[in-house]
Amino acid sequence: MEPSALRKAGSEQEEGFEGLPRRVTDLGMVSNLRRSNSSLFKSWRLQCPFGNNDKQESLSSWIPENIKKKECVYFVESSKLSDAGKVVCQCGYTHEQHLEEATKPHTFQGTQWDPKKHVQEMPTDAFGDIVFTGLSQKVKKYVRVSQDTPSSVIYHLMTQHWGLDVPNLLISVTGGAKNFNMKPRLKSIFRRGLVKVAQTTGAWIITGGSHTGVMKQVGEAVRDFSLSSSYKEGELITIGVATWGTVHRREGLIHPTGSFPAEYILDEDGQGNLTCLDSNHSHFILVDDGTHGQYGVEIPLRTRLEKFISEQTKERGGVAIKIPIVCVVLEGGPGTLHTIDNATTNGTPCVVVEGSGRVADVIAQVANLPVSDITISLIQQKLSVFFQEMFETFTESRIVEWTKKIQDIVRRRQLLTVFREGKDGQQDVDVAILQALLKASRSQDHFGHENWDHQLKLAVAWNRVDIARSEIFMDEWQWKPSDLHPTMTAALISNKPEFVKLFLENGVQLKEFVTWDTLLYLYENLDPSCLFHSKLQKVLVEDPERPACAPAAPRLQMHHVAQVLRELLGDFTQPLYPRPRHNDRLRLLLPVPHVKLNVQGVSLRSLYKRSSGHVTFTMDPIRDLLIWAIVQNRRELAGIIWAQSQDCIAAALACSKILKELSKEEEDTDSSEEMLALAEEYEHRAIGVFTECYRKDEERAQKLLTRVSEAWGKTTCLQLALEAKDMKFVSHGGIQAFLTKVWWGQLSVDNGLWRVTLCMLAFPLLLTGLISFREKRLQDVGTPAARARAFFTAPVVVFHLNILSYFAFLCLFAYVLMVDFQPVPSWCECAIYLWLFSLVCEEMRQLFYDPDECGLMKKAALYFSDFWNKLDVGAILLFVAGLTCRLIPATLYPGRVILSLDFILFCLRLMHIFTISKTLGPKIIIVKRMMKDVFFFLFLLAVWVVSFGVAKQAILIHNERRVDWLFRGAVYHSYLTIFGQIPGYIDGVNFNPEHCSPNGTDPYKPKCPESDATQQRPAFPEWLTVLLLCLYLLFTNILLLNLLIAMFNYTFQQVQEHTDQIWKFQRHDLIEEYHGRPAAPPPFILLSHLQLFIKRVVLKTPAKRHKQLKNKLEKNEEAALLSWEIYLKENYLQNRQFQQKQRPEQKIEDISNKVDAMVDLLDLDPLKRSGSMEQRLASLEEQVAQTAQALHWIVRTLRASGFSSEADVPTLASQKAAEEPDAEPGGRKKTEEPGDSYHVNARHLLYPNCPVTRFPVPNEKVPWETEFLIYDPPFYTAERKDAAAMDPMGDTLEPLSTIQYNVVDGLRDRRSFHGPYTVQAGLPLNPMGRTGLRGRGSLSCFGPNHTLYPMVTRWRRNEDGAICRKSIKKMLEVLVVKLPLSEHWALPGGSREPGEMLPRKLKRILRQEHWPSFENLLKCGMEVYKGYMDDPRNTDNAWIETVAVSVHFQDQNDVELNRLNSNLHACDSGASIRWQVVDRRIPLYANHKTLLQKAAAEFGAHY
C-alpha cells in the first residue's frame, strides 16, 4: 500500500477518508522563477515609502489577531536550576520571565505542572523584520507562532503578507543539529547542488533555522550564492523553522506592535545550551510551546506545514498539480530518523547524502539490502560504527525501534534515494533530487500527465536527458506530441540539443510545433550575447513604419527578422516573412531580458493555450527553426533540426552564407572562428547530400541546383553557393559538369575546340556533321537554320566570337592611336566610336537586366561590386573624356594622351577572358592579391624612401626652392637608388661643378651640393652620406624587398593550393555572363540591343532568367524531387554516422562506455542484478509459504480431532504467519521485497486516526513463535457510533469472556479463513503475527472482521462498440465509488451488518429494490480472493479478512448491467460513482488495486 494512503484507511467503517487538498490560486506567477520577492519588495520600498508604512500597519494588526504565542500562566518550581543557578519553573523560565499573575497563589496550587492546563495562548508579540548586526544588512522576516497555529494561517502569512511566490518545489533539509565535519569535496557538492536546484526551480528551502549543523551548511551555501550572483538572479527563499524557547537573545525580537526592523546579534560564544539564528536565512518561523530550552518543539508544526504546502495545487497552464516536496538528509540522530520515517510515511521522497555521517550513513549502508536482511543485529553493528560516542546509551528497545523504522524506510524504496559522491553518474545533489522526484512520481497514482509534465520540466532544467530517457519516456505513459510542445520550447531556448532530439524521437513534429506565435516567442528570447540580437534591435529602432506615438521599446514582428535575414542572405533573395496586414497584434517587447527559461513553463503553456484557437503555421517550420538556431551559432541544435529539413541542400548552403556574413561582423575572435568552422561544416553537408544525389541520378541532381526554392527567398542552390563563396561545393564534379553543359549550350561537350573554331571561321561546315549536338532532333534531322541557331547561341561560341571581336577592336584602336590619328576623325576612328557605343549598350543592358526584380539601386550596387564592371566603366568614362578633348582642336594632343592611357585599361580588360583558362585563371587571382600586398608594402617602403631622401637632400643641398627638383632630390632619386641608380655626387668623388647650378638658377640642372669654392671640393661630410646610403640600401634592397618577395610567395602558395577550386568557382561568372549575352559580337550586337529595347521598353515584356540556370518546377514535380532528396539525405546521414563510428577515437569511446556500463552492472545490488530471477524466486517462495500454511492447518485439524497424540505430531518449520498466503491484498506488489513476507501495513507505528503509537515490531519478531521478551504493546479500543454492533470496550478482560472464538457467535461469524486461531488470556491472536498493538483498535470486533468486496467489471469499448485493447490485451472497466472527504476511489465494498450479505457502502449507492438481484449476482460471481487482508487497522487481537467476488458483464447490452446502471445512485451528497478503466496507475486504494489485479489476471485483461 502507498504510505500516504495507509493511515487514511482506518476509519470506523472503511469509509472515513481524508478530505481533498485545498486549492490555492497562483499568486502573481511570472515566467522567471528566480525572481525573488525580497528584491521586488526592496525596490517597492524605495519607490513607495508611504505604501510600505501602510503594509507595516496592516501586518501589525493582522498578525496579533490571527497568530498566537504561548505563555506559562502558573509557576511550578522545578527541581533543576538554570545555568545561572536561579530557580526556574518546570517550563524552564524564571520568576521574572513569567507573567505577574503566574507567580501568585492559584487554583492549581499543589498540582503537577501540565502544559495543557498551565500554558495559554496569547497574541504574539514578536514579528516583523530582522537585521543581523555587523553582518549582512539585508532585511529578513520573522514571526513567533504557537505550536498549534494552523498551517493555513502560516501559509497565508508567507504568501500574502510576506509576498513570497508560491513555490514550484519544496526542499526540506534535515539532519544534524550540532556542528559536524563533512569532507570538503562533499560539502562543495552539496552546496552547489542545493543552490542549483533551488535557483533553477524557484524552490523554498526549509531548515531548522539555527546557526549550527546542517542549517549552517545550508546558510553558507545560500551566502556563497548571494555573493556570486547578480541582482537579476534574485534571492533564494530559505525558511528557518526553529524553536522559540531555544533562540539565544530572543528578547530583542519582542515588540507588541512588531519590529521594523529588530536588530539581532549573532553571539555564538555566549549562547550556552541555546542556539543563534542563522544570518543567511531569509525568513524565520519561531515555534513557541511556552517552554524554555526544550528542543524539537518545531518538528510537529514543521511537518504539518510542509505537508500542507505540498498538498496545495498550483495552476500550470490550465492544469492544477500539487507542489512537489523532497527531503534532503545530512548526518542526524534520532530526531532525523523520526523525520525520515514520517516523511516517507506521508509519501515524501527523501535524498540521503552518504558520507555525511550517523543516521544518513546507516540508512545508506542498508538501502540496497532486502528488508529481510535488515536485522536487529545488523543495525546494532551499524550503530556501533557510526554512533561510537553514544552507542553505550542505546537500549535494546531503542535498537528495536531503530530497526523497525529503518525497515519501513527501506521498504519504501521508491521514496528513498541515496546520493553517493561520484557514483551512479550522480555528480551533484540536484541530480539526486531529480531522481527522487521522478521515482516518487512514478509510484503515485494519477490520471493526467501533469505530474510527468512537471518532472520532465525538472529534467530539462537540469539537463539530464539520460534520466528523462530512462525514467520518464517509458511504455507505461504515452506522451501526446502536443504535451511536449512547451517543454520543447524550453529546451530550444535553453540550448538543450539532446532533449530536442529526445522529443523528436517521441513524436514531436516540427511542422506542428512551429507556429507564428512560437517562432515569435523564440526570437523574443534570443541570447542577448549573439550578434543577431543586436542587429535585430537596430532594425527595430530604425523601423520607418514605427508610429510616432509608439513606446520606447518597439514591438517585434517577423518582418523585422526577415529584414535582418535578407541582409545576411543577400538582396537576391525575397523576404522570408511577409509584412503583416495589421500591426495591432499584442507582442512582447524587445529587448527581452535573457531569462534562463524556468521549468514550470507558465508563459509557454499560456502561449500554446492562447494560440490553440487560431493556430497559424509558417510556410516551412523546419527552415524557421533552423535559422533561429543558426543565427545563435548553436551547432548541435542546428544539426538536429537540419536533419529534419526538407530542402536540405539549399538549407545547408543558406546556413553557410548566414554564418559567413555573421562572422565578418563578429568582434569576438573565438566566436567568429566557430562560425566559420560551422559554415564549412554545412558546406560539407551540402556536398555530401549532393554527392549522393549525383551518384543516383545526374539529371535530377542538376535539377536541384537550378530549382527555385520558395522557402529560401525564391533563389537556387547554385546562387546560394556562389553568394556564400562555397568554393568546395561549386568545384564539385557534378556542378562543374552542369556548368560545362551550360557552357556548351545545345552543343555536345565532346566537341573539340578546334571544331568550333573551324565552324566559326567557315560556318558552312555545320552542315557536314563536324559539330555534334546533344539533342537528337538537331543531330539527325535538324534544319540548317536550327543547327546554326543552336551553334551561334552556345555560350562557348559567343565567347570566342567576342574574343575575336575584342582583339579586332584593340588592333583597330592601336592602329588609330599610332598611325591614323587625324584632326578630322577617319573612318577607322569612327568605327572605333561605333564599336565603343556597342560596348556601352552592352554594359547598360547588364546594369538594367533585373530578372529577380531587385530594384535599380540594388542592381546597380550588385553590378559595381564586380571588379571587371568597374574596370569597364572606368575605361568607358576615360574614353569619353579623351574623345571630348580630341574633338576640341585646342586639346587634340591631351585627348590623344588620354585615349592612349585608356588603351591600357582596355588591354587590362583582356585578363577577364583568361578566367576560363585553368592555367591563367588562378594567376589573375594571384596578381590581384599581390597588388594588395604591394599596396600595403608601399607604406613600409615610403618610410625609408622619404626619411633617407629628406636627410640626404638636407645634408647635400642648401635651400632648394624649386619644387620639381626638391621632389626629385627627396623622393625620386631615393626611389631610383633601390634599383641601382646611385647618385654620383653623394660621396664627392664624381663631383663636377659643371653638371650643376651653384645658385639653382638653371631649370635644367640640379643645385650644387655644399662645396668649397676655393678648392672646388664638396664641403659636406662624405662619410655620413655614404653611411646613410649603405644603411638605406641594406634595409630597402635586402630587408624590404625580400619581405615583399616573401609576401608574394605566401600569396602564391595560398592560391596555388586551391588553384582548382578557384578556377572552377570563377569560371561560373564568365559562363553566366555569356550564357545571358546576345549571340552577336560587337558591333553587330547593336541589332540585339535594338530588339531588346523594343521588347522591354515598347512592348513592356518583363525580363526572365534563362531556365537553364533558374527553373521553377511544377508542384508535383517539385514534391517528388524533394522527397527523393530527403531519401538520399537519410543515406548520407547514415553513411556519415557509420564513418564516425569507424574512427579510432569513436571506437575507443564506445569501448570505454561499454566498460563503464559493465562496471555499473557489476556494482548493482543483488536485487537489481538478478532481475526476473528474483521475481521467480519470490513466486516460488509464495507457493512454498502457502503449502506450509496448508500443512500447519492439516496438522492442527488432525490433532484437534484426536487422530494423533501430541508426541506423534511432526516437527514443522515455524509458520511465518505472514508469508503472503495469497496476501497481496495486504497492499504489496508480488515482487516488492523478496523475503519480506510479513504483514506490513498492520505494523505501522502510527495507528490511523488516533494518537496511539504501536510498539515497534521488526520483521524477525513478527511470528508468535519467535521470542520477543521486551514486547509490551499498548492496549487500544476505539469508540464507535454503532456500539450495539461491536464488542465490549475497555482493557479489562471480564466483559470479553462471553465471546466465543473460532465459531459462529450469534450473528457474527468469528471463524477465520485460515483455520482455527490461538486464543490467549481470553483474546484471539492475529494468525499473521505481532502488530505492536493490543485490543480491538478501530475495528468492530475481536478476532476476524469479515468484509466483502464486489468487483463489478465490464469491457471498455470505443464509440463503435469494439473492445479497446492495450498491449494486445483487452481493457476492463470497474465500478468505483468516491465518498465525501475521501481522496481515493474505492471498490463499493467493506464491512457488513451481522447477518447481512451486502456491504454497507454498496447499499449507499444501490437502490434498495435492486438489493436482492445484486445478491444473486454475487452468488453467481467468481471468488477471486479469500483470506487475510494486511490493513493498518489490524491489531494483535482483531484483524480483517475479506472475500473478493468478481461480477463481470461480457455483453454491453446485458439486461442485468443495464438494470444495475439504472439503479445506481448516490445517497450521500458529494458521493461520486463512475466506471473506471482498470490500470495499475489509477488512484485506487492499494488493497483494492491488488484485488483488481487478480480479477484482471483471471480475465487475461490489461492491468
Curated annotation (Swiss-Prot):
The keyword Ribonucleoprotein does not apply. InterPro entries: Ion_trans_dom (IPR005821), NUDIX_hydrolase-like_dom_sf (IPR015797), NUDIX_hydrolase_dom (IPR000086), TRPM (IPR050927), TRPM_SLOG (IPR041491). Changing residue 1404 to Q: Abolishes channel activity. Changing residue 1433 to A: Abolishes channel activation in response to ADP-ribose/Ca(2+). Changing residue 958 to A: No effect on channel activity. Residues 817-827, 889-896, 951-970, 986-1022 are extracellular. Keywords: Calcium, Calcium channel, Calcium transport, Cell membrane, Cell projection, Cytoplasmic vesicle, Disulfide bond, Ion channel, Ion transport, Lysosome, Membrane, Metal-binding, Phosphoprotein, Sodium, Sodium channel, Sodium transport, Transmembrane, Transmembrane helix, Transport. Changing residue 1407 to G: No effect on channel activity. Homotetramer. Isoform 1 can interact with isoform 3. This interaction decreases Ca(2+) influx through isoform 1 and suppresses susceptibility to oxidative stress-induced cell death. This is Transient receptor potential cation channel subfamily M member 2.
